[in-house]
Amino acid sequence: MATVQYYGTGRRKEAVARVRLMPGKGNIIINNRPLEEYFTLDTLKYTVKQPLILTETIDKFDVYAKVSGGGLTGQAGAVRLGIARALVKVDSELRPILKKAGFLTRDPRMKERRKYGLKKARKAPQFSKR
């Protein structure tokens, strides 16, 4: 007997998360490791749990996520977007709640490219008048 699964994909900066929601007790597994082990900072743990807390479904679903690329903050944001998108597939009535909180919006901010003649994206070499 196959269990019901809901999928959601999230991206943030260079991170990509493929999230799977299954009915369960509230376990969150990221890259085959528990949430507490993968994200050690409390702010990142909270970021991942935000959509579940807002919709009061934290103890109703098990979350399995595969995330790659980027840093920890980008990965946490990607997982959050993936969870929110999967929750909308579970129950479409959650959409306005998640939309109002901004959890269904893909954050478009990316790292700015480095320009030639500059040291970084905007940092110029020291200017000497004489």
From Swiss-Prot:
It comes from the Bacteria. InterPro entries: Ribosomal_Su5_D2-typ_SF (IPR020568), Ribosomal_uS9 (IPR000754), Ribosomal_uS9_bac/plastid (IPR023035), Ribosomal_uS9_CS (IPR020574), Ribsml_uS5_D2-typ_fold_subgr (IPR014721). One of its GO terms (molecular function) is structural constituent of ribosome. This is Small ribosomal subunit protein uS9. Keywords: Ribonucleoprotein, Ribosomal protein. Residues 111-130 are annotated as: Disordered. PANTHER family: RIBOSOMAL PROTEIN S9, SMALL RIBOSOMAL SUBUNIT PROTEIN US9M. One of its GO terms (cellular component) is cytosolic small ribosomal subunit. One of its GO terms (biological process) is translation. It holds the Pfam family Ribosomal_S9. Belongs to the universal ribosomal protein uS9 family.
